[in-house]
């Protein structure tokens, strides 16, 4: 008898297919998992009614895939191309959970770049107004108050930056979320960085990562993201590096590459725009709102206050007509600060939320 973690079932099944003259007895659970996690034969999960006419066929497949993995408490990486609607696929899963969980409902946590936090709020309010959502913001005491009352909400959204600052509050709270979603999962590419260390300390029943870039581009990044969605699945980084990364990157070992692909394939779903081109609608324009970072806001407000007074004095002295050039110059400066303060201030090295969103 061989006992393996349940999440290695499909990998084992692929290996067994290559073994000849070997008799294997497979129990009911084994056969069920193999069948259900076949991406061509996903379990039929009921899509929430309001999404039936919104989700495109490939997005419905994404919903089924997320739900099937969650049924076994597996994690996964949704790696569709940018613009293919990863957010709405996740929202449909969150709504499905709320509809089907009658008792002991848990809160879910979405962690994103600060520039996308408001986008999550807007998308949820647009497509799933029944979800009670809260974006964590404010000073340290205000954020702590929200975290200590997370049970009041269906979904909490925070940024990677705030999660790093608040991690001790989460640990003290000791709450197990229903889902934790890591948006723009390339933020976890460095396993030793604070972003990755913080989010990996948060407890959840199921973990999913979203990224629009091919994760196979960097094997170290691949390992770090898997270490978040299913800790231990790709072993320790030391073992992963010696078994796969070194063999593939330095030695071009095709056998190691094939084995790694077999390992990760059930838990990564990636569709490109080219693959689903016939399902895509005509081009639409979406206005994304962006909130300035703390340092950027301080600079903007400081310049605004000083400039308003100067312009008022200028108008009082020379009249509106003669002051128009200075008014235009001031507006240009404010616009530059909104775009990126480095356009206005030399050696400005703080993050810029608008640039991050782009």
Where on the chain are the PLM-derived regions?
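Long, charge-dense, solvent-exposed interaction surfaces that engage phosphate-rich ligands
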Residues: 257-259
């Amino acid at each position: 008898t061989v006992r393996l973690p349940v999440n290695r079932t499909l990998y084992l099944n692929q290996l067994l297919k290559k073994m000849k003259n070997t008799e294997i007895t497979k129990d009911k659970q084994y056969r069920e998992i193999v069948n259900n996690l076949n991406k061509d034969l996903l379990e039929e999960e009921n899509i929430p009614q309001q999404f039936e006419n919104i989700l495109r066929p490939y997005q419905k497949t994404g919903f089924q895939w997320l739900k099937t993995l969650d049924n076994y408490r597996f994690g996964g990486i949704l790696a569709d191309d940018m613009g293919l609607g990863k957010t709405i696929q996740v929202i449909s899963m969150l709504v499905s959970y709320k509809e089907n969980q009658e008792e002991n409902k848990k809160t879910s946590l979405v962690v994103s770049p600060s520039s996308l936090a408001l986008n999550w709020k807007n998308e949820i309010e647009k497509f799933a107004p029944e979800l009670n959502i809260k974006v964590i913001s404010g000073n340290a005491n205000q954020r702590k108050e929200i975290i200590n009352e997370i049970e009041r909400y269906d979904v909490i959204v925070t940024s990677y930056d705030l999660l790093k600052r608040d991690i001790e509050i989460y640990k003290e709270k000791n709450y197990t979320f229903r889902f934790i979603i890591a948006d723009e999962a390339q933020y976890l590419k460095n396993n030793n960085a604070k972003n990755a260390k913080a989010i990996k300390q948060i407890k959840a029943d199921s973990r999913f990562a979203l990224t629009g870039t091919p994760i196979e581009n960097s094997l170290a990044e691949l390992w770090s993201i898997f270490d978040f969605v299913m800790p231990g699945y790709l072993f320790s980084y030391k073992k992963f590096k010696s078994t796969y990364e070194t063999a593939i990157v330095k030695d071009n070992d095709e056998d190691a590459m094939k084995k790694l692909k077999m390992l990760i394939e059930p838990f990564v779903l990636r569709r490109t725009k080219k693959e689903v081109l016939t399902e895509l609608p005509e081009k639409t324009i979406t206005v994304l709102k962006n909130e300035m970072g703390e340092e950027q806001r301080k600079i903007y407000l400081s310049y605004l206050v000083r400039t308003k007074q100067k312009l008022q004095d200028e108008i009082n002295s020379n009249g509106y007509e003669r002051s128009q050039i200075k008014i235009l110059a001031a507006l240009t400066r404010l616009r530059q600060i909104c775009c990126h303060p480095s356009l206005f201030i030399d050696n400005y090295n703080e993050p810029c939320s608008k640039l991050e969103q782009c």
